[in-house]
């Protein structure tokens, strides 16, 4: 049994009444909703004013019989079930009228979740939003027009019965007077043959107004009222926003320009036009794809094309496919594979020029269907990057961002309102509705296949606009690039669109080809190293917990990945840098998983437990803070606390200490440690000596946890996933020209971010292997950026050092430090050593061994100078004063005055022209510096030095890849490019021709500019071949 809360009686308002005794009312009182079987079941109804009734017109006589009021649709010949159904309806009406009465006669609106109006809450509720705002007028006797939301009222009073069979509903309150009776009237409607209504309905309590849902109600028991919270059935999504409505109206205007192709016959006629009459046009193409997560999955082997659009045009205008239709929209969602295949002659024709936005994605999903796409003419994303490489932070390179930007589309200004791309989120996104009926912040979008089926016309307009916008964007960017001069080696070479045609168009096609090839991954090996990594991670975490638990007992249960728990151990009591007076507490409780199964006797084992952590050290030096003002516990901070502890020492328990099974320590004789330089700031903070060493080793173990977690989550686990690979087990990462310098970036997965070889502790590169019968060639440039810097600056010292060969960084150290030079000249050390037969070691130490500190500084300076680093940055790297770092810089520049002069020239040029150029003539733009502050100017000056060096290195790598791709002999041997990672390329081909192929690759990379080298220095290339990437390094 479910019982509703009592409802307040509504004040009666007299309406016109009918007191006739005939079961059939006069025509002027007929209900517009009377039954169709009128003759056999004449309706009992009465009219009223066209608004609402404050009273439901339902009550109980002194004998307990129901009296029907104004809205009864029954007569004495009606069946019991009809009375039951009508009773329900009257109850809903009574509830609704009570709601309306509260709104009309009360002083405040009704609030969500409250049907009972309490005048004492009028003031308190003044800030609540109104539930009902207006009344709608309609036909008399219409329930719909007696409240704003019937369903809402229903759900506020209806309670589901536990029984399968619906039961009668009864509202009992002797104070309720029917509208067709004056006060004191005893008229009531009798049953047929003088049977009262009471005899056919269950007994109900008259003591209080109750909603009862049950088969029967006991006569002799007082009913206990039960309240149950009922959530109204609000819609899942909010209504469209004004922005969305306006966007939809504008979008719908292009529908008349779209030709819908959804059958084979119309597809054939369209393809005939595309391949004959309009073959010489530029064709902008775009696809819409279902069943793919574009952020996580590769399009190679994933996704399903549900539709595509083609918009064609030339310098004279757009193509006309009949009746002014300028765009084709092709439906291939439900059984449209045959329609798609009809377009194979169009997609596969290399002489039909096709432009795309994000070409690599569209071509992969089309080729998943068995069509080999050819005729690549342009990718508007690449054109936009070539025109302005700095848009990543100023509008971006999305189709929406580009086509709605006046600066981009001003070449086709008149078409901007028609061609500006509108996002799917704007058109189809709706905010979710919370349980209380208010709008949430989360915007959701229905699956694209559902949108195409259920909102077809709008979806056709949305998806067709992609190709329309792409065509206009191509025209605008082409005009801009044709208006921009291409300067190569200080000489005019044509326009930047000529540069695109010569370099970036074939490079874009090559990158897509490399993505399609992919690289084979040994998942069994990855699974093995994952187990090893997890084991070592747990060992390191346990070591830290055991050490910390000596100072704070509950630390053995702590979560080592929790920043707050780590901060609690090391930085309790520290004041927030942003909020003066607010400090991190000295102790704090945390909830952690109850892995030990600790439970109170007689109770269930809880999933979590509470631990208390307190600060275990005081006065730790703090150099870094989070944006919220608390001390940072990042990897860099923890490494500065730990120092440089060798990895093999980390997995030992502690220097001079062992632990027994219960975690207590077994003291061993303390060892003498002469050199404390490897230890970090924690050594002194924990008192030095044995305790300081233990602290540094434990914190180093914590750093190790973070490092292993990064390898597991960033490389080992993702490389085993199906989302980035296809059925053959090859990984297909996305290669993009989307960096400001022109360097490639990679995602899903980011193979550009592989750990450095010396830090690749699990040898992850061993997992990248050649297919059976094949071999990998790995070729890498040596010190490419430094050689580029020597060429651009024409630095005599650097050119001579590269010409002499050997260890460039050792030569730099020799030129910087006089005592190192003296040692070389006196033959106390050697710059480099080439062993002869029978020689095991050099006759005297090598410079890199005897003067390791000086060489490390020289090496860091070599790369830092190329990246535009200043004395301030170097002082942070070396942990020295700015003055000392500046003095070291002067030593470097002493023999390299040409570099200093070139850097000053680049800074001035960038501030004046707001751009700098790479070796091949690509530009890197900067914002106007007229009103820029010192910080922004400093950033531009560093970028003005870095961009030409890194950008030129990217030019060299690109030309080398194109040279390899053009080589006919490599194609004949069956070798193909797979990856480019920074200055390194990876190829795969037959094992039997590996040696010959390696020689050709080295030649191509050494002379990347159409078989020549235009630089003033040689390009050193190191190449090997093996079965795995790691083995070939």
Curated annotation (Swiss-Prot):
Residues 696-1030 are annotated as: Polymerase. It catalyses: DNA(n) + a 2'-deoxyribonucleoside 5'-triphosphate = DNA(n+1) + diphosphate. Its EC number is 2.7.7.7. The keyword Nucleotidyltransferase applies. GO terms for biological process: DNA-templated DNA replication; double-strand break repair. Inhibited by dideoxythymidine-triphosphate (ddTTP), but not by aphidicolin and N-ethylmaleimide. Residues 115-124 have a biased composition (Basic and acidic residues). Expressed in shoot apical meristem, root apical meristem, leaf primordia and the marginal meristem. Keywords: Chloroplast, DNA damage, DNA repair, DNA replication, DNA-binding, DNA-directed DNA polymerase, Exonuclease, Hydrolase, Nuclease, Nucleotidyltransferase, Plastid, Transferase, Transit peptide. It is found in: Plastid, Chloroplast. Residues 125-142 have a biased composition (Polar residues). GO terms for molecular function: 3'-5' exonuclease activity; DNA binding; DNA-directed DNA polymerase activity. SMART domains: POLAc. It holds the Pfam family DNA_pol_A. Residues 321-482 form the 3'-5' exonuclease domain. The keyword Transmembrane helix does not apply. Residues 1-32, 104-142 are annotated as: Disordered. GO terms for cellular component: chloroplast. SUPFAM superfamilies: DNA/RNA polymerases, Ribonuclease H-like. Residues 1-55 form a transit peptide. InterPro entries: 3'-5'_exonuclease_dom, DNA-dir_DNA_pol_A_palm_dom, DNA/RNA_pol_sf, DNA_polymerase_A, RNaseH-like_sf, RNaseH_sf. Residues 1-11 have a biased composition (Pro residues). Belongs to the DNA polymerase type-A family. In addition to polymerase activity, this DNA polymerase exhibits 5'-3' exonuclease activity. May be required for DNA replication and accumulation in plastids. This is DNA polymerase I A, chloroplastic. It comes from Oryza sativa subsp. japonica (Rice).
């Amino acid at each position: 049994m479910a019982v509703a809360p009592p409802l307040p009686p509504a004040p009666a308002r007299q309406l016109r009444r009918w007191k006739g005794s005939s079961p059939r009312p006069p025509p002027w009182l007929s209900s517009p909703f009377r039954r169709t079987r009128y003759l056999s079941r004449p309706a009992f109804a009465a009219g009223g004013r066209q608004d609402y009734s404050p009273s439901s017109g339902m009550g109980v006589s002194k004998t307990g019989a129901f009296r029907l009021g104004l809205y009864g649709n029954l007569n004495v010949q009606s069946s019991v079930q009809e009375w039951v159904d009508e009773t329900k309806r009257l109850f809903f009406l009574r509830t609704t009228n009570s709601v309306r009465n509260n709104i009309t006669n009360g002083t405040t609106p009704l609030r969500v979740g409250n049907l009972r109006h309490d005048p004492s809450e009028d003031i308190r509720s003044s800030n609540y939003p109104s539930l009902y705002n207006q009344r709608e007028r309609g036909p008399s006797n219409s329930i719909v027009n007696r409240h704003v939301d019937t369903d809402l009222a229903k759900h506020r009073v209806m309670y589901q019965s536990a029984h399968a069979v619906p039961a009668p509903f009864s509202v009992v309150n002797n104070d309720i007077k029917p509208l067709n009776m004056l006060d004191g009237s005893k008229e009531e409607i009798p049953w047929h043959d003088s049977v009262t209504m009471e005899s056919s309905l269950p007994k109900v309590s008259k003591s209080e107004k109750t909603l009862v849902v049950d088969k029967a109600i006991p006569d002799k028991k007082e009913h206990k009222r039960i309240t149950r919270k009922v959530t109204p059935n609000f819609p899942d999504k909010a209504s469209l926003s004004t922005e969305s409505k306006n966007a939809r109206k504008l979008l719908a205007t292009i529908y008349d320009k779209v030709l819908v192709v959804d059958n084979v016959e119309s597809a054939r006629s369209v393809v005939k036009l595309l391949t004959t009459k309009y073959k010489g046009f530029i064709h902008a193409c775009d696809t819409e794809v279902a069943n793919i997560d574009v952020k996580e999955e590769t399009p190679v082997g994933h996704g399903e094309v549900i539709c595509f659009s083609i918009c064609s045009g030339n310098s004279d205008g757009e193509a006309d496919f009949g009746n002014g239709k300028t765009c084709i929209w092709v439906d291939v969602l439900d059984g449209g594979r045959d329609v798609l295949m009809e377009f194979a002659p169009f997609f596969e024709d290399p002489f039909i020029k096709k432009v795309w936005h994000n070409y690599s994605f569209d071509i992969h999903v089309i080729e998943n269907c068995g069509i080999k796409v050819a005729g690549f003419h342009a990718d508007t994303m690449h054109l936009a990057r070539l025109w302005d490489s700095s848009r990543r932070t100023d509008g971006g390179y999305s189709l929406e961002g580009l086509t709605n930007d006046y600066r981009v589309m001003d070449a086709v200004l008149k078409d901007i309102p028609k061609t500006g791309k509108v996002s799917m989120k704007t058109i189809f996104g709706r905010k979710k509705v919370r349980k209380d009926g208010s709008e949430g912040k989360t915007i959701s979008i229905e699956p694209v296949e559902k949108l195409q089926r259920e909102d077809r016309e709008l979806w056709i307009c949305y998806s067709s606009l992609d190709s329309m916008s792409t065509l206009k964007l191509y025209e605008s960017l082409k005009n801009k690039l044709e208006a921009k001069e291409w300067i190569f080696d200080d000489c005019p070479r044509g326009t930047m669109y000529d540069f695109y045609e010569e370099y970036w168009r074939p490079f874009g096609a090559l990158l897509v080809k490399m993505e399609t090839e992919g690289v084979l991954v040994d998942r069994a090996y990855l699974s093995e190293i994952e187990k090893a990594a997890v084991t070592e991670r747990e060992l390191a975490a346990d070591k830290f917990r055991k050490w910390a638990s000596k100072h704070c007992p509950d630390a053995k249960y702590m979560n080592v990945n929790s920043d707050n728990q780590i901060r609690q151990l090391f930085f309790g009591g520290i004041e927030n840098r942003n909020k003066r007076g607010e400090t991190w507490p000295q102790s704090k409780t945390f909830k952690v998983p109850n892995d030990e199964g600790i439970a109170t006797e007689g109770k269930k084992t809880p999933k979590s437990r509470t631990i208390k952590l307190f600060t275990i050290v005081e006065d730790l030096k703090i150099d870094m803070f989070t944006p919220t003002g608390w001390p940072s516990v990042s990897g860099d901070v923890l490494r500065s606390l730990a120092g440089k502890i060798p990895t093999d020492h980390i997995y030992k328990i502690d220097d001079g200490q062992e632990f027994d099974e219960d975690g207590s320590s077994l003291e061993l004789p303390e060892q003498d440690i002469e050199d404390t330089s490897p230890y970090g700031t924690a050594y002194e903070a924990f008192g030095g000596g044995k305790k300081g060493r233990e602290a540094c080793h434990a914190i180093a173990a914590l750093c190790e946890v973070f490092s292993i977690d990064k390898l597991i989550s960033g490389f080992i686990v993702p490389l085993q996933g199906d989302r980035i690979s296809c059925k053959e087990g090859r990984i297909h990462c996305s290669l993009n020209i989307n960096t400001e310098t022109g360097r490639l970036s990679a995602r899903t997965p980011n193979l550009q971010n592989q750990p450095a070889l010396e830090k690749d502790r699990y040898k992850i590169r061993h997992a990248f292997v050649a297919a059976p019968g094949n071999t990998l060639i790995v070729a890498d440039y040596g010190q490419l950026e430094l050689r580029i810097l020597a060429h651009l600056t024409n630095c005599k010292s650097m050119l001579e050092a590269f010409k002499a060969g050997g260890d460039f960084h050792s030569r730099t150290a020799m030129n910087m430090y006089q005592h190192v030079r003296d040692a070389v000249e006196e033959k106390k050390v050697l710059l480099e050593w080439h062993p002869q037969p029978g020689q095991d070691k050099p006759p005297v130490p090598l410079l890199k061994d005897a003067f390791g500190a000086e060489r490390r500084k020289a090496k860091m300076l070599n790369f830092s100078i190329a990246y535009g680093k200043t004395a301030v940055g170097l002082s942070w790297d070396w942990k020295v004063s700015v003055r000392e770092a500046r003095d070291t810089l002067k030593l470097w520049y002493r023999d390299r005055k040409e570099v200093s002069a070139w850097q000053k020239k680049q800074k001035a040029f960038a501030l004046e022209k707001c751009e700098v150029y790479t070796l091949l003539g690509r530009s890197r733009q900067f914002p106007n510096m007229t009103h820029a502050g010192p910080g922004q100017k400093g950033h531009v000056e560093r970028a003005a030095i870095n961009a030409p060096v890194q950008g030129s290195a990217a030019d060299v790598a690109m030309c080398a890849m194109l040279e390899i791709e053009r080589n006919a002999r490599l194609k004949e041997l069956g070798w193909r490019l797979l990856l480019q990672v920074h200055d390194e390329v990876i190829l795969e081909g037959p094992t039997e021709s590996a040696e010959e192929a390696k020689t050709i690759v080295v030649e191509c990379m050494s002379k990347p500019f159409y078989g020549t080298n235009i630089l003033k220095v040689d390009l050193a290339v190191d190449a090997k071949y093996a079965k795995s990437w790691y083995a070939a390094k």
